[in-house]
């Protein structure tokens, strides 16, 4: 994806790295510092809108919670609907759920059963791609409802954690605005 290197540099430099959080040996990439910088936040959304404007998406699906912060403004910029995927018990209408594995245990996500139809071409958006488990579960939910999903966008990717390979194996084309080495 050809994007303005100056803008991509602004985005990457706006993301603070917190050593040893949430545990020793981890370099935490704090996307909230990007949100605090209005210029960088707007540039992030503008780049994604520009890239996806002519792709024909009908819905954006964002994963709880930081996927909402990028998915919803992107949906507005594209003039299409936004669908949240949430933890169990947070959505008021009928839902379906999908479990997925975590490093220690498992979790699940839910989506409204009427939020996606067979006519929908869906873009999945999240702030960060690590192992890919959350997005894999999200893709399964969308496909179970009949939606077409072949694309996912992330502000940050941590390629060493294997998520990119996991999601490309699902047939997804990935857009990542910046990458960081390590965990």
UniProtKB/Swiss-Prot annotation:
This protein's pathway: Purine metabolism; AMP biosynthesis via salvage pathway; AMP from adenine: step 1/1
Organism of origin: Shewanella oneidensis (strain ATCC 700550 / JCM 31522 / CIP 106686 / LMG 19005 / NCIMB 14063 / MR-1)
Top-level taxon of the source organism: Bacteria
Family listed: Belongs to the purine/pyrimidine phosphoribosyltransferase family.
GO terms (BP aspect): adenine salvage; AMP salvage; purine ribonucleoside salvage
Keywords: Cytoplasm, Glycosyltransferase, Purine salvage, Transferase
Catalysed reaction, written as an equation: AMP + diphosphate = 5-phospho-alpha-D-ribose 1-diphosphate + adenine
UniProt cross-references to InterPro entries, sorted A to Z: Ade_phspho_trans, PRibTrfase_dom, PRTase-like, UPRTase/APRTase
Annotated compartments: Cytoplasm
Protein encoded by which gene: apt
Designated name of the protein: Adenine phosphoribosyltransferase
UniProt GO cellular component terms: cytoplasm
Oligomer status and interactors: Homodimer.
Entry's EC annotation: 2.4.2.7
Its biological purpose: Catalyzes a salvage reaction resulting in the formation of AMP, that is energically less costly than de novo synthesis.
Entry's Gene Ontology molecular function annotations: adenine binding; adenine phosphoribosyltransferase activity; AMP binding
Pfam families reported in the protein's UniProt record: Pribosyltran
